[in-house]
């Protein structure tokens, strides 16, 4: 027999954990839709030449290629005949949702209304080295607003408001959206004489490692042979990226101080103006000032970000790292269309986030089953009645399971308890004679009688009370 096992780098959940994961997906989807984002799905695999247009190097080494058995046989036959294999396989699994979005918008450009607001929540695949907390298959939950030729900076503020709404409803603890602008960093580097484009990008990538590797590591790297930046300039860079704001007024004050202390730079001025407008609009959108701050070290390692950048962290669990990130880019689909399509967006890596929360013991207060009631079967003669009770419960909005085979009532209770089902409905001859059913509440360990016509509404009230207590407990815990 073959040993049943999953490939490395896969998160496979038992039902009660899958319920918790699914509810997080539901919360994210609900908030994306509340802000007017439209759902999009793209194929799990794309044409290789389309998918890999913007990539190379490390990304290409992590791509999973797809080959049919027929294509494999043809390639093998060609190899036997000494022919070249024709390059990469025709298809490849997507490694993120951004490149498929670029292809999607370019392909359907004339059928879409701009600004195009899309959300996408699907699995992506990367050939990561198998290790704890790293996944080869994982969910990403993205939103993007795409403009045609131009896109107002106001959308950058709205995206931050979406981040706040999502994590406030998820209820996984206090969080902070850290905000910066790549133009701010580029303008500051220009004032130091670090103006060459490739060098700037390389420095930005190193600055983005400060929270993970520490300032000493970044200092040693920048003064080392690879960069050779004078120690005095590196010290100024590290002092600049150490800036953090504390509250809305302090954030504006930090920008004001920067505006008056650094040499003139058009790029720096643009970055300051954009950040100031985002901050003012975030306040107007009702995001509490405790939920965001300036962090001048946030750069985002990806080179296509050109303006606003975001990283979100849990205040009490910084070891988890970024739980949501993104930013502004000038042109989404330049490899696929001549149209200029600027945009702003963010991504939540939900699989990694869920795994980290579970490891930290933060996945709590979740029902053990999506089944809310089970109708017990007392004996074979009661099957039609049990099925009718279940039908009425389902019509009343109660997720209901029926025991299809009569067993000892103790075993039926035991099954319901193990399955995480709260209510067991009993309808024997005695209950039928009195026009009621008996309900066993396995959470409160109580049993009560209910009129048949009132069963669904009674259970709805009980479930609503339980949900209210859960919300109250979450608020008190905060």
UniProtKB/Swiss-Prot annotation:
Main location (coarse class): cytoplasm
Keyword Plastid among UniProt keywords: no
InterPro entries: aa-tRNA-synth_II (IPR006195), aa-tRNA-synth_II/BPL/LPL (IPR045864), Anticodon-bd (IPR004154), Anticodon-bd_dom_sf (IPR036621), His-tRNA-ligase (IPR015807), HisRS-like_core (IPR041715), HisRS/HisZ (IPR004516), HisRS_anticodon (IPR033656)
Annotated compartments: Cytoplasm
Gene3D superfamilies membership: Anticodon-binding domain, Bira Bifunctional Protein, Domain 2
Entry EC no(s): 6.1.1.21
Catalytic activity: tRNA(His) + L-histidine + ATP = L-histidyl-tRNA(His) + AMP + diphosphate + H(+)
GO CC terms: cytoplasm
Domain of life of the organism encoding this protein: Bacteria
GO molecular function, one term: ATP binding
Keywords: Aminoacyl-tRNA synthetase, ATP-binding, Cytoplasm, Ligase, Nucleotide-binding, Protein biosynthesis
GO biological process, one term: histidyl-tRNA aminoacylation
Subunit details: Homodimer.
Family (UniProt): Belongs to the class-II aminoacyl-tRNA synthetase family.
HAMAP family for this protein: His_tRNA_synth
Name assigned to this protein: Histidine--tRNA ligase
